């Protein structure tokens, strides 16, 4: 797809500095710039790298700059770059239809222009919304509802009664609605707690590959609107996540935890059961939250157990000083021993 800089600037609401008739057909990353491409560069070093390359033009943020290359200046260059990715590399259009190997249960409702791929199983009573895409080898349980324009990638399993919203993307091998990990030790054995609930995934959620979201013991496990979940995340039974949360890889959230809106979980965070997390909390990588804790709005937490950032940094600095403190104590102990020995000698001389 060839586009002139003039057309690109109109698309991203930017301004061309230089020859706006130049055309480009592709985008390049800053570490592999192709001849004749458009490259997004931020920072002085990257801009110089782009200027010395064979790129046709550079996408940059606003500001005064002299460059030998044509420029497209925009208010938000990364947002513009996303728009250009969609422009130059639009997603492959999938023709609607039901593959002959798919198994469709009784009273299943398929919306307009739905695609059901090879070896998909949809159990009885389920509803698939308009323009949704179910790729190969997916299992949809009984009475599942999936909204419009939702894409389910291969090998996903969605258990009975779950509710998936519109504009949702679920990546490969994720499991929605499996039993929670609930047991109680009775009479010398682990007695399983039945899980009769389901999972609700609200609109505009994206879930990465190999993630598991367990159904509630009773009622619903809820993933709030606009939340984005990375690969390899575990969300336990009866968890309720607010809107627009970010959950990075290897994070585990234990049962009955609730979060507000715009909460960020960095990688490998562990949250115990019955924790309440208010809006706009940030949990740093490898943070561990003990059971029944209440994390306050807008606070950054670090460490294990989780502490507010300032407290955690002071604690870490103190821990790092322990070897020096021990060395000083040892030195002082030796000095005291020498002084005591001298005092003992003087005391004997007086006698």
Swiss-Prot record:
PROSITE patterns: HEXAPEP_TRANSFERASES (PS00101). This is UDP-3-O-acylglucosamine N-acyltransferase 1. Homotrimer. The active site is at 237 (proton acceptor). Its EC number is 2.3.1.191. It catalyses: a UDP-3-O-[(3R)-3-hydroxyacyl]-alpha-D-glucosamine + a (3R)-hydroxyacyl-[ACP] = a UDP-2-N,3-O-bis[(3R)-3-hydroxyacyl]-alpha-D-glucosamine + holo-[ACP] + H(+). The keyword Lipid metabolism applies. The lineage of its organism: Bacteria, Pseudomonadati, Pseudomonadota, Gammaproteobacteria, Legionellales. It comes from Legionella pneumophila subsp. pneumophila (strain Philadelphia 1 / ATCC 33152 / DSM 7513). One of its GO terms (molecular function) is N-acyltransferase activity.
């Amino acid at each position: 797809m060839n586009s002139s800089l003039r057309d690109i600037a109109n698309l991203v609401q930017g301004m061309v500095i230089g020859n706006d008739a130049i055309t480009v057909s592709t985008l390049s990353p800053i570490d592999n710039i192709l001849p004749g491409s458009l490259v997004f560069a931020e920072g002085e070093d990257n801009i110089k790298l782009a200027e010395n390359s064979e790129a046709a033009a550079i996408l940059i943020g606003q500001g005064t700059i002299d460059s030998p290359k044509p420029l497209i200046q925009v208010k938000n260059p990364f947002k513009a770059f996303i728009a250009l990715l969609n422009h130059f590399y639009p997603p492959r259009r999938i023709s609607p239809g039901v593959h002959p190997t798919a198994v469709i249960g009784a009273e299943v409702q398929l919306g307009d222009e739905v695609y059901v791929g090879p070896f998909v199983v949809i159990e009885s009573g389920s509803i698939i919304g308009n323009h949704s895409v179910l790729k190969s080898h997916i299992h949809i349980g009984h009475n599942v509802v999936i909204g419009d324009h939702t894409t389910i990638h291969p090998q996903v399993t969605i258990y009975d009664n779950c509710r998936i919203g519109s504009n949702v993307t679920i990546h490969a091998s994720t499991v929605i609605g499996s039993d929670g990990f609930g047991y109680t030790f009775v009479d010398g054995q682990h007695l399983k707690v039945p899980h009769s609930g389901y999972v609700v995934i609200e609109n505009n959620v994206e879930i990465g590959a190999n993630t598991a979201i367990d159904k509630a013991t009773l009622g619903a496990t809820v993933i709030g609107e606009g939340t984005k979940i990375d690969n390899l995340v575990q969300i336990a039974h009866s968890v309720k996540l607010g809107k627009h949360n970010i959950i990075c890889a290897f994070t585990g959230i234990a049962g009955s935890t609730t979060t507000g809106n715009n909460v960020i979980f960095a990688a490998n965070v562990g949250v115990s059961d019955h924790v309440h997390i208010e809006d706009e909390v940030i949990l740093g990588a490898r943070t561990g939250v003990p059971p029944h804790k209440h994390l306050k709005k807008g606070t950054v937490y670090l460490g294990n157990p989780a502490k507010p950032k300032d407290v955690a940094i002071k604690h870490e600095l103190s821990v790092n000083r322990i070897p020096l403190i021990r060395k000083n104590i040892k030195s002082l102990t030796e000095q005291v021993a020498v002084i005591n020995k001298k005092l003992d000698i003087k005391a004997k001389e007086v006698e």
